[in-house]
Structure formats: C-alpha cells, structure tokens
Amino acid sequence: MAIKKYKPTSNGRRNMTSLVYKDVITKTTPEKSLLDSQSHSAGRNNAGKMTVRHRGGGNKRQYRIIDFKRIKDDVPATVKAIEYDPNRTANIALLVYADGVKSYIIAPKGLKVGDKVQSGPEADIKTGNALPLKNIPFGTVIHNIELKPGKGGQLVRSAGTSAQLLGKANDEKYVLVRLSSGEVRMVLSVNRATIGAVGNEEHELVNVGKAGRTRWAGQRPHVRGSVMNPNDHPHGGGEGKAPVGLPSPLSPWGKKTVGKKTRSKKNKTEKFIVRHRKGSKM
C-alpha cells in the first residue's frame, strides 16, 4: 500500500502522511449481516467514574464481527473483498464459503480477491488457511494464534505483525512460538493459527501530523504531570520548569513508573514463557 505525503499548506498538514487505501481496499461498504453496534463509555465505569484516562469523543463506528476461531472445517471459501476496519489496524477480508455463509477474517499479507482459503487439520500450508499448530511445519510464519482451544485467536492480530513456529517443546503437548516481541512461548499444539503475516504493514509508517486525527480515533490529550499542580500529580508544582524532585518518576497515583516492571513473577502463565521479550530482565 502506498503512502501519501501532503503538501505543507498548514502546520497540521506539514509532514502529515496517510495510506492510499484504494490500492488495496476493494469494497467500501461493509457487509450488513456482519455488523454490530457498539457503545462508547469514554473511559468511565457503571458509576460514571473515570477508570481509563485519555479516552472520549471520536467518530462513531460499527463493529465488524470477525471470525477469530476459524472452525468451519473442510469447507473452501473465496475471498470476495478486502475491506477497511475502523476498529483495528489490520484490514479485513470478506469470505464467502461454498455453502453461502459469509464471514470476516483478518487479511494476511498477500491475500487477494479471488483467492481460496480453508480451515481444518487437512488444509494446505497456504496464506490465509487456518490449522492446528501440530499440523503446521516448523519455521512457518503464522498469526491469529489461539491460547485456549476453541477460544479464537488472541495473539498476533495487529497490522504487520507475525510469529514463527519454532518446534516442539519438551512436552509433546506444546509447541514453541516466537512472537514479534522476541518472546518465545509454549502454546498447546491443538490450538489453531493462520498461515502468513498480518497485512497492512505500512500502518506504522503513517505520520499523524495533527492532534485532530488522534481525537477522531477517540483519544484525548495526554497531559504531562510536571505541568500539573501538586495536588493533581506527584511531579506537579514548583517554580517554572521544575525537575521531578524524586528518586524515581511516579505515576499519578504515586507508584514507581518508567522502567519499573509491573508483571508479577507469580503470574500463572510464567511457566509457558521460555524466553522473555527483548529488553526484559525478568
């Protein structure tokens, strides 16, 4: 997908870039039967109290129902369209199965309109096909990886990401998967994954250019603690541009941050991690 750079007709346009979706997107209106409504809470809970900061506003969106499970085995499907999805960074592909059922999947890199895809243990090792990990050759690039059998893919779903199947673990029940972060993890061999890398890899190269584009996405301004008052943030107060004045930077609630490890060493999933991600010292 090409990247369009705008002329500097204003400060907001200077250095702004965007993706040229017409190069890839073949259908602009979503499939009505695969849409669902979604409400936005602007980061508030049922009591109206803010539980997540920097959320609110943004364009209204309709949720596209994505098939992360891929359990319709041995029924071939044809890719009818590649569509834009405002709810995720990756594009989505509209599939029409041989029995007439329609569904959306995350569009892998290289998948085109007219391609045939299939799921099941006997499916070919081909981009877009979904198989149990035990049926995939070692070294294959995969995405949309399940963590629990039948729950649907949870890992590696963002634009441009991919994982690699490395081999069997000591226990025959598990296989080793290297994630895009560098983490090597044990995953049950009966879990499913989709062949190929997630498409739309140019997404990370886009320069937003102006604050308004992040507001359209439902994100509100992230204010630095050093420009707040002392009663609002531990970094606040002082005359002019004052330093933090503390041994370590703190969060708004007084907890150590910036480099402080937050993952518990007693986490029950720790036993599945063979090697931590790059830069981790846990």
From Swiss-Prot:
InterPro entries assigned: NA-bd_OB-fold (IPR012340), Rib_uL2_dom2 (IPR014722), Ribosomal_uL2 (IPR002171), Ribosomal_uL2_bac/org-type (IPR005880), Ribosomal_uL2_C (IPR022669), Ribosomal_uL2_CS (IPR022671), Ribosomal_uL2_dom3 (IPR014726), Ribosomal_uL2_RNA-bd_dom (IPR022666)
Ranges annotated as biased composition (Basic residues): 257-266
A molecular function (GO) term: rRNA binding
SUPFAM superfamilies per UniProt: Nucleic acid-binding proteins, Translation proteins SH3-like domain
Function: One of the primary rRNA binding proteins. Required for association of the 30S and 50S subunits to form the 70S ribosome, for tRNA binding and peptide bond formation. It has been suggested to have peptidyltransferase activity; this is somewhat controversial. Makes several contacts with the 16S rRNA in the 70S ribosome.
Protein name (database record): Large ribosomal subunit protein uL2
Annotated segments matching region Disordered: 31-56, 226-282
Matching PROSITE patterns: RIBOSOMAL_L2
UniProt keyword Phosphoprotein present: no
Entry keyword set: Ribonucleoprotein, Ribosomal protein, RNA-binding, rRNA-binding
Gene3D superfamilies referenced in this protein's UniProt entry, alphabetically: 2.30.30.30, Nucleic acid-binding proteins, Ribosomal protein L2, domain 3
Cellular-component GO terms for this entry: large ribosomal subunit
Family note: Belongs to the universal ribosomal protein uL2 family.
Pfam family, one: Ribosomal_L2_C
Extent of Polar residues compositional bias: 35-44
Single Gene Ontology BP annotation: cytoplasmic translation
Assembly, per entry: Part of the 50S ribosomal subunit. Forms a bridge to the 30S subunit in the 70S ribosome.
